[in-house]
């Protein structure tokens, strides 16, 4: 199999407008540019500050990013965060070891890296390539017709061939493409997220159980409580430490909206107070205390029913990433699946051509929808099963709410797949015959198809 070669800028005559310049949006912008499309990108933030904690990036996502930059800068940066931890040891609230979660693919390109740092290097790469990216612009109005798509900013029309919404679960693009499930809902779960500089942990002997001067091998430790799962991990050979604390039965009481939680830090004691009765609190507290004040946040975890389409009826608006399929952090696939969407989109648009934008967008959806839906829903299922289980059963392989590394997910090359499958998808769309993707095993495809078919039965859980 061969990965399609990039053909250089401005060869296709297609102008792609991208709304949202996070990981998915920036990957789409660079991929589209390299496939020959003209790109105009917008983000409401005035500066793409390095907010956020860490994210797992598996090879199905990282290889796409490595190939976006011919200077090797992205690949070199990802390599500095290569993950060499082999397992995550899990303890109960008494500090008793109850199981461990294997991390088997650390030698195949698995990385644990800072989310904000990844956004920064992608943005720098896009600017070096000369992409037209406009920050501090909130898009409130957009239109499409059979000939073009436009965004309207202070009365000024910016015209393109299509609009791609990559602006998260609360995207306005959802209502432009789907007749159902356009509003995400609070899942009943939230996650505390934080980041600490590795040097701060090394200076404190109370943190040496997680990271010391000899910490070239990364560590990951989980603590399983009745209503919260806390995971602390180091990465980059001790460059940084990350925290996630997934909690249920949590009433949203904060003033920050679901749209700005990434940039609204909270008091770390809020999380610590919730686990103050744990016997292992004195082990956890020193590490949490080292988390940067402006990098410790509380994220409501949103769910959304399956959209009946990722593409508008006219065929010039599409959603990708969390705008199409919001993920839980326990999936370890949110970033990688957004990257797969983005890279696939760039290729299918190039293969469809300027005169058939709708085909390009619908082909992307056909290739991606079942795969992304299954990975998303399976992570929700594992999360719910864990939190719904008796505490005494959270041992061994069930000690953590994690799905693990699955080969058919992590070893997939979405670019080769998009290139090889396009003709078959095009024929399916032309004839109306169902397209059965091969980037997902048959049993998982059947489950995803059932979820998609029953999308109108999904109700918000209160």
Swiss-Prot record:
**Pathway this chain belongs to:** Secondary metabolite biosynthesis
- Subcellular location, record wording: Membrane
Which catalytic residues are annotated? 193
A Pfam family of the record is FAD_binding_3
Q: Does the keyword Transmembrane apply?
A: yes
What residues bear carbohydrate chains? 10, 60
Topological category with respect to the lipid bilayer: Single-pass membrane protein
- Name any cofactors this protein relies on: FAD
- EC? 1.-.-.-
List all membrane-crossing ranges: 14-34
Q: Which GO terms describe its biological process?
A: biosynthetic process
Q: Which residues form a coiled coil?
A: none
InterPro entries from the UniProt entry: FAD-bd (IPR002938), FAD-dep_Monooxygenase_BioMet (IPR050493), FAD/NAD-bd_sf (IPR036188)
Would you tell me the protein name for this molecule? FAD-dependent monooxygenase opaC
Q: What is the lineage of its organism?
A: Eukaryota, Fungi, Dikarya, Ascomycota, Pezizomycotina
Name of the gene encoding the protein in the UniProt record: opaC
